[in-house]
């Protein structure tokens, strides 16, 4: 494993954590809230975005306009079954989601959820570090690297790890601030 490859993998882990954070509801309407919603469409779980157009007419409303009106009920069921805690209303043409202001209790729940997502991101980065260091040690054992080169590469990998974990911590702080700001 080369250093550039390790850095790319760590960057992808940070991006995945960011995407996970985007699916956590903060009290403002945002179509990325619905990214994880899978709708049963002819027996196949299908991403909601593939079945409908999503718009945000104002800061507290999401409109879901299905391309096929027969999917309205399935879309509603998928939203109710999700962990978003939102109640959809259906007028026969569109599904309307009104995002209520977050209660203090719900904010705390979401903060815990976000902290868990951040920890998953950190674990992912640490696993990449472990794989990278194992690769360096293996190359040293095979005689491809000197002991000094190996130590230097391991230090570089640790610096990358620290940098990317710091990025996840910054994303976490930003998201928690977003959750606590009314």
Swiss-Prot record:
Q: What is its main location?
A: cytoplasm
Keyword Cytoplasm among UniProt keywords? yes
Looking up InterPro entries in the UniProt record yields:
Ribosome_recyc_fac, Ribosome_recyc_fac_dom, RRF_sf
Carries keyword Cytoplasm? yes
Q: Which CDD domains match?
A: RRF
What processes does the entry annotate via GO biological process terms?
A: translational termination
Keywords linked to the UniProt accession: Cytoplasm, Protein biosynthesis
A single GO molecular function, which one?
ribosomal large subunit binding
Annotated Gene Ontology cellular component terms: cytoplasm
In terms of SUPFAM superfamilies, this protein maps to: Ribosome recycling factor, RRF
Q: This protein's superkingdom?
A: Bacteria
Q: Where in the cell is it found?
A: Cytoplasm
Matching entries from HAMAP family are given as: RRF
What this chain does, per the entry, is described as: Responsible for the release of ribosomes from messenger RNA at the termination of protein biosynthesis. May increase the efficiency of translation by recycling ribosomes from one round of translation to another.
Q: Which family does it belong to?
A: Belongs to the RRF family.
- In Swiss-Prot or TrEMBL terms, this protein is called Ribosome-recycling factor
């Amino acid at each position: 494993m080369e250093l550039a490859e390790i850095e790319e993998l760590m960057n992808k882990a940070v991006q995945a954590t960011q995407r996970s954070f985007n699916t956590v509801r903060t009290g403002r309407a945002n179509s990325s809230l619905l990214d994880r919603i899978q709708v049963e469409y002819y027996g196949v779980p299908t991403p909601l975005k593939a079945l409908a157009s999503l718009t945000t007419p104002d800061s507290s409303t999401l409109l879901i306009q299905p391309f096929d009106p027969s999917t309205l009920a399935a879309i509603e069921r998928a939203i109710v079954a999700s962990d978003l805690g939102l109640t959809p209303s259906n007028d026969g043409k569109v599904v309307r989601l009104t995002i209520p202001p977050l209660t203090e209790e719900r904010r705390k729940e979401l903060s815990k959820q976000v902290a868990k997502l951040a920890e998953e991101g950190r674990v992912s980065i640490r696993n990449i570090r472990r794989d990278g260091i194992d690769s360096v040690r293996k190359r040293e054992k095979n005689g491809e690297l000197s002991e000094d080169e190996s130590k230097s590469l391991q230090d570089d990998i640790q610096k990358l790890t620290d940098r990317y974990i710091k990025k996840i911590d910054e994303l976490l702080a930003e998201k928690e601030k977003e959750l606590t700001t009314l």
